[in-house]
């Protein structure tokens, strides 16, 4: 088979299909998507032989906005004997190189979630059988491809593989984050996931550390402010609404009752700007660009709400506009975007200046 499979948020299949069509054409790999509403995945069938393999290697997974996972399809098995599913699966991968990890997964839908327990239990005997057949390393080996079993029903499975240097490291492409009991709102998980997604661990001590200052636009009740405070930052929380008392008691938060679109810091020393305001994407994009153009921040994470039908087109337009505006400023600006697991009808965008970051990494913090 010459297919790629992409996991995505249910309801965003058409956006995922539009994105992969654009990206594949840019790499001169042509094909078409098979899409079903609210199924949680998209199949992209390539016309050219070996194009699926080429895309899996050349298309940077981190640059895909709507994809939770990307894998090359080996085979689809239907009508599996419920008394012996393992034998045909092992036979299907006999001609493949040895794999370094096994993930037995399903779609992130209410219907498919009923298979979660089965997938977890089935992975144990399947892992043993694959190792006995020499198709899976004794321990997880990050140098080898990951074998994916994607079950639609308990007798129907897609078999595929991904490359560890170009995939999501998470089961089903979903990071497992626990909601902190003292956080003011569940939105806190959006920013925590964004930090995990966009900031490499080796940079935590210079980009997510105490001593930095941050501004949270539209902060109330403080879900995003909470993530900044727990990392030791001093935060200006901008919102006419109330802030959680627990955050105010930390001594790290200054609550400024003002409009998030008109507020600017009196001292242009904030490192972080974060924003989760409910507003049209174009207006948020313009606001973020203004902050960078006025030198009011060095890094930003913000959400673009997507209630419209053509969401991928809206995202691409706003990111292109932001890129144009940032190109007018001295710097080497990087824009990253992802629909995170904890996002809903929205995506999260990260912007930073590579030059300034390089200076921070070298120890020059100005």
From Swiss-Prot:
Active-site residue list: 305
Methyltransferase keyword on record: yes
Quaternary context: Monomer.
Catalytic class of the enzyme: transferase
Record keywords: Cytoplasm, Methyltransferase, rRNA processing, S-adenosyl-L-methionine, Transferase
Lineage: Bacteria, Pseudomonadati, Pseudomonadota, Gammaproteobacteria, Aeromonadales
Subcellular location: Cytoplasm
EC code: 2.1.1.186
Similarity remark: Belongs to the class I-like SAM-binding methyltransferase superfamily. RNA methyltransferase RlmE family. RlmM subfamily.
Residues the entry annotates as binding S-adenosyl-L-methionine: 187, 220-223, 239, 259, 276
Protein's organism: Tolumonas auensis (strain DSM 9187 / NBRC 110442 / TA 4)
Protein name listed in UniProt: Ribosomal RNA large subunit methyltransferase M
Record field: catalytic activity: cytidine(2498) in 23S rRNA + S-adenosyl-L-methionine = 2'-O-methylcytidine(2498) in 23S rRNA + S-adenosyl-L-homocysteine + H(+)
Pfam family, one: FtsJ
Role summary: Catalyzes the 2'-O-methylation at nucleotide C2498 in 23S rRNA.
Listed GO CC annotations: cytoplasm
Gene Ontology molecular function: any one: S-adenosylmethionine-dependent methyltransferase activity
GO biological process, one term: rRNA processing
UniProt-listed InterPro entries: RlmM_FDX, RlmM_THUMP-like, RNA_MeTrfase_FtsJ_dom, rRNA_MeTrfase_M, SAM-dependent_MTases_sf
Coiled coil: none
């Amino acid at each position: 088979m010459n297919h790629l499979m992409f996991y995505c948020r249910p309801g965003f299949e058409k956006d995922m299909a539009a994105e992969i069509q654009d990206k594949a054409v840019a790499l001169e790999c042509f094909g078409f998507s098979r899409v079903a509403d609210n199924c949680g995945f998209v199949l992209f069938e390539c016309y050219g032989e070996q194009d699926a393999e080429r895309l899996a290697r050349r298309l940077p997974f981190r640059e895909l906005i709507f994809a939770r996972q990307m894998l090359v399809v080996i085979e689809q098995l239907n009508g599996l004997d419920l008394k012996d599913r393992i034998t045909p699966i092992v036979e299907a991968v006999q001609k493949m190189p040895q794999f370094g990890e096994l993930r037995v997964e399903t779609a992130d839908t209410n219907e498919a979630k009923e298979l979660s327990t089965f997938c977890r239990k089935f992975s144990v005997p399947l892992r043993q059988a694959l190792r006995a057949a020499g198709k899976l390393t004794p321990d997880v080996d990050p140098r080898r491809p990951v074998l994916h079993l994607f079950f639609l029903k308990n007798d129907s499975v897609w078999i595929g593989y991904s490359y560890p240097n170009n995939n999501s490291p998470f089961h089903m492409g979903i990071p497992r984050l626990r909601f902190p009991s003292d956080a003011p709102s569940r939105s806190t998980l959006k920013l925590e996931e964004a930090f995990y997604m966009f900031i490499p661990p080796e940079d935590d001590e210079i980009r997510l550390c105490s001593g930095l200052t941050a501004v949270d636009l539209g902060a109330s009740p403080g879900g995003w402010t909470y993530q900044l405070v727990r990392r030791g930052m001093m935060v200006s929380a901008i919102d006419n609404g109330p802030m959680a008392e627990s955050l105010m008691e930390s001594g790290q938060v200054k609550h400024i009752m003002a409009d998030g679109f008109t507020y600017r810091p009196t001292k242009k020393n904030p490192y972080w700007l974060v924003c989760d305001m409910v507003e049209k994407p174009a207006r948020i994009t313009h606001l973020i660009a203004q902050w960078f153009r006025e030198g009011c921040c060095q890094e930003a994470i913000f959400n673009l709400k997507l209630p419209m039908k053509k969401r991928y087109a809206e995202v691409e337009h706003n990111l292109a506009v932001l890129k144009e505006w940032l190109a007018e400023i001295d710097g080497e600006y990087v824009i990253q975007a992802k629909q995170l697991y904890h996002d809903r009808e929205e995506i999260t965008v990260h912007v930073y200046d590579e030059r300034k970051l390089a200076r921070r990494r070298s120890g020059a913090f100005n």
